[in-house]
Regions:
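PLP-dependent aminotransferase-like
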Residues: 78-167, 174
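Compositionally biased, intrinsically disordered low-complexity segments enriched
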Residues: 5, 43, 143-145, 171
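Conserved PLP-binding active-site segment in aminotransferase class I/II-type PLP enzymes
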Residues: 1-79, 83, 150, 157
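Active-site-adjacent capping/gating segments
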Residues: 170, 177-178
């Protein structure tokens, strides 16, 4: 057996073949320095421009950037008025924040099984988990795929529930042409 390159064996990929990504040039450096020295780093011109472009790219009129998907989920939970004793339906097949953000607001995550073809929330499993304390459904869009939002939204409307879409792992995904 040949020795691994890390232990002195022959390299398969030469150092000059390794490219850094993304490529960084002088204009990138200038933009970073401009942002670092700005008086308003969180709502500065670069943030506002990017929010506007991102909203347009998604076919929306507004976008609000946060430092993480976790922070965005906290904002959604708080914005829906979810709190102590409330239930929020979510899949366990996700980043932990999809459930822990619920706990941080003193609510209880209720785990819904996934569709094993898509690894997304299975709408057929949602209604059985709804209780009088259920306030919302967090739909986690993964791997560039979208859950069956027609079914999820119909169930949510029937039971007067909020729908929160966690699309941190599906930017640019489309559902029925949108």
């Amino acid at each position: 057996m040949q020795e691994l390159a890390i232990y002195g064996g022959t390299r398969v990929i030469q150092p000059e073949e390794v490219r850094s990504w993304p490529p960084v040039d002088k204009s990138d450096e200038e933009l970073v320095l401009d942002a670092l020295y700005a008086k308003n780093q969180t709502r500065g011109k670069h943030n506002l421009e990017l929010e506007k472009e991102f909203a347009a790219w998604n076919g929306n009129s507004h976008a609000l950037f946060t430092n993480s998907g976790t922070a965005a989920l906290h904002m959604c939970i708080a914005g829906c008025g979810i709190g102590a004793g409330d239930h929020v339906l979510v899949t366990a097949y996700s980043w932990s924040s999809s459930a822990t953000c619920i706990l941080h607001h003193d609510a209880l995550p209720i785990f819904i099984d996934i569709d094993f073809d898509t690894f997304l929330i299975d709408p057929d499993k949602i209604e059985a988990a709804i209780t009088p304390r259920t306030r919302a459904i967090i739909v986690v869009q993964l791997h560039g795929l979208c859950a069956d939002m027609d079914a999820v939204n119909a169930i949510a409307a029937k039971h007067n529930l909020y729908v929160i879409e966690d699309a941190c792992q599906a930017h640019g995904a489309t559902y029925k042409g949108r």
